[in-house]
């Protein structure tokens, strides 16, 4: 039944068609989820996908664009219910391509109990 706040910052590189996809997940039946998220597509210059989520992801969020670096940022609060488990950031390359999508060292999740 712990309450948490968190901040996530992910830097990735992707090829022209591989792109990036992600979702957030956690223990079932939280009592509160409020997550602000946005991203910059590969080689982009402006935020996109700006949203406030009130539940964990039910589908992947695709970050499709051009080859190059991109960013995903999230922050929020989670009030966990009675079920144990971890908050997770899950990611993958969105489409098959010869160039691997890479999450760069220095990407992070910070959290604290409230």
Regions found by a protein language model. Give the residues of each.
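Surface-exposed molecular-recognition determinants
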Residues: 1-114
């Amino acid at each position: 039944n712990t309450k948490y706040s968190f901040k996530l910052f992910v830097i990735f590189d992707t090829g022209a068609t591989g792109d990036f996809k992600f979702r957030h997940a956690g223990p079932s039946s939280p009592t509160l989820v409020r997550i602000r998220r946005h991203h910059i597509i590969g080689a982009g210059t402006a935020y996109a996908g700006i949203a406030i989520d009130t539940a964990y992801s039910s589908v992947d969020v695709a970050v499709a664009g051009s080859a190059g670096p991109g960013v995903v940022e999230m922050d929020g609060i989670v009030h966990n219910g009675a079920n144990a488990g971890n908050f997770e950031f899950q990611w993958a390359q969105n489409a098959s391509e010869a160039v691997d999508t890479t999450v760069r060292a220095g990407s992070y999740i910070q959290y604290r109990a409230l």
